[in-house]
Swiss-Prot record:
NAD(+) binds at V16, D37, K42, Y68, G82, A83, T104, A121, S122, N123, T146. Catalyzes the conversion of lactate to pyruvate. Belongs to the LDH/MDH superfamily. LDH family. InterPro entries: L-lactate/malate_DH, L-lactate_DH, L-lactate_DH_AS, Lactate/malate_DH_C, Lactate/malate_DH_N, Lactate_DH/Glyco_Ohase_4_C, NAD(P)-bd_dom_sf. This is L-lactate dehydrogenase 2. It holds the Pfam family Ldh_1_C. The active site is at H178 (proton acceptor). Gene3D superfamilies: Lactate dehydrogenase/glycoside hydrolase, family 4, C-terminal, NAD(P)-binding Rossmann-like Domain. Pathway: Fermentation; pyruvate fermentation to lactate; (S)-lactate from pyruvate: step 1/1. Beta-D-fructose 1,6-bisphosphate binds at R156, H171. Its EC number is 1.1.1.27. Homotetramer. Substrate binds at Q85, R91, N123, P124, V125, D126, D151, T152, T153, R154, T232. It comes from Enterococcus faecalis (strain ATCC 700802 / V583).
Amino acid sequence: MKVFNKKVAIIGTGFVGTSIAYSMINQGIANELILVDIDKAKSEGEAIDLLDGVSWGQENVNVWAGDYQDCQDADIVVITAGANQKPGQSRLDLVSINAEIMKTIVNNIMKSGFDGILVIASNPVDVLTYVAWQASGLPVSRVIGTGTTLDTTRFRKELSQRLAIDPRNVHGYIIGEHGDSEVAVWSHTMIGTKPILEIVDTTERLTSDDLPIISDKVKNTAYEIIDRKQATYYGIGMSTARIVKAILNNEQAILPVSAYLDGQYGQQDVFTGIPAVVGNQGVTDIIELNLNAAEKELFQKSVTQLKQVMASLQPNA
């Protein structure tokens, strides 16, 4: 079994990168955190600020500002760098500029001799995870996007608030694109041990009419946040930290990450958000949900949209 030193590098020290670092320190996930940014003074300042709180955390974490060469012996490199989503802009609108940024970053990481696991948190995450995989030359199992982890926790939050229960007792997934074409899998959503479709219309808290409203609210949460504060970062910070924790601790946890499909769900050669088993080898298995007809159709549309965007990035497209 692979033994980790629990050394993690984070590329990009904007709101998302520092939120990931902050979440990891508070949870004692890593032993060493390296912050890498084109603005070295910024990464140095963030490292100093984060270190000031380490003594109140669960573990003693060494946090410092480095460069790409320091990724050489990292267990995980988390990539957050890229252009930010602006009000009125979809995640897919970012694709051209961020694809080029991603290629440059990954090339710099791989030049260091890095041979660990890449976790991608830049948007549009499904497309950029594919770009990172191609640029890295790593096995598909060791290139993981944050996928629909954030969408899934938003989904569980909405249901928990409506039903007045702990969100940790809501079991359900958002799959597909992390974005406008994402799919809520109602057919496999459980409240405790009870299917949610058996609960619908038995309580005034949740009716059939509420289901599409909830799906849309989950889908549009990012836009709502961006309209109010220009960026989202705490939720994705905690979601990314959860993925890193599963890898470093070899949890074999089922998480809705952006993983490579090679025949699963009837799809080929695409990264998208689906439940997958995550441990110290990266993604070791894809969990295939038995989707109903409507969910299959929506998932197909979501994947098709991602493939169209990928095709637009090809030189001769």
